Every structure is written in C-alpha cells, then in structure tokens.
C-alpha cells in the first residue's frame, strides 16, 4: 500500500469519514496508481507531494505529523 504525503511536513492525504476522531489516511494499492493520481492534479501537486510506501516507520511518521497515536490511524483505499 502507498500513501501521498506533503513533502514539507509529511502530513498524508486524508479523508474525513466521521465527525469525531482523526481523518483516515487515503491509500492506493500500487505506487503507479498513487503517482497517476498525483500527476492528474498537476505540476504543483507533484512538486509539493510525494508517494511513500506504508511501512511501520512511515505509518508512525504520518501519525506523528497528524498529531495522533499510531494505533488510532485508519487507512481507507482510494477511491472510497
């Protein structure tokens, strides 16, 4: 699985699924799919964001950048 994060602060693209709790991190099932989505948004998005594989370390970093505990992070596939 892959996520797209803002290069400056590593905050991932998220989706608001409910009124309370943290937003869910949007995931893609393959790097090419995530890159295609990013490129479809234009050059500014490509310059500002990067595609990262979801690993224990990257998930911990994304949770930290969102200000939540790693165990509170929810992943949701794109499109949802």
Each language-model region and where it sits:
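Short aromatic-glycine-(Arg/Gly/Cys) micro-motifs in beta-strand/loop hairpins
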Residues: 1-24
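Hydrophobic beta-strand residues in large extracellular and virion-surface proteins
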Residues: 3-5, 28, 34, 51, ...
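Short, surface-exposed beta-strand-loop junctions and turns on beta-sheet-rich folds
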Residues: 11, 20, 33, 42-44
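Extended catalytic/binding region for NAD+/ADP-ribose chemistry, centered on the ART fold
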Residues: 20-37
